[in-house]
């Protein structure tokens, strides 16, 4: 059964739906029952001949539809916020990827230039790094 707060909170919608469903209801009829679910059911029952159960089911469906619409709107808002956050994250990732790719390309070019201009030093450094890596692997396996 519909309670007083639900009815008052959605009075305009309830009133409109009642007049749509039962065309013989007038504005004056509905104003007699404003705020009281029991009076509203009584007025609608008296004017239309509908059963109390039928009227209560109709009122529940009107108010439940309103609740469902509100829930749907809330879900839609959260969905839009999540999409915006995902788009921002993707843009940030793209931007940083491009920055890192250009930096790594610059480092690669600098390294190639250094190897061309100083081949002996580059070879000695590469040899030293190879010895260090081999020692780490060799002594790491003994433990």
From Swiss-Prot:
Disulfide bonds: none annotated. It comes from the Bacteria. InterPro entries: CsbD, UPF0337_stress_rsp, YjbJ_sf. It holds the Pfam family CsbD. Belongs to the UPF0337 (CsbD) family. This is UPF0337 protein RB4474. The lineage of its organism: Bacteria, Pseudomonadati, Planctomycetota, Planctomycetia, Pirellulales.
């Amino acid at each position: 059964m519909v309670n007083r707060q639900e009815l008052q909170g959605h009075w305009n919608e309830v009133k409109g739906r009642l007049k749509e469903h039962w065309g013989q209801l007038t504005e004056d009829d509905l104003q007699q029952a404003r705020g009281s679910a029991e009076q509203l059911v009584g007025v609608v029952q008296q004017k239309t001949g509908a059963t109390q159960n039928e009227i209560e089911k109709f009122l529940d469906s009107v108010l439940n539809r309103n609740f469902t619409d509100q829930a749907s709107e809330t879900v839609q808002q959260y969905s839009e916020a999540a999409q915006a956050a995902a788009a921002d994250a993707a843009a940030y990732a793209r931007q940083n990827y491009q920055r890192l790719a250009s930096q790594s390309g610059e480092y690669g070019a600098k390294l190639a230039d250094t190897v061309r201009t100083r081949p002996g030093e580059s070879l000695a450094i590469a040899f030293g790094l190879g010895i260090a890596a081999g020692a780490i692997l060799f002594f790491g396996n003994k433990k």
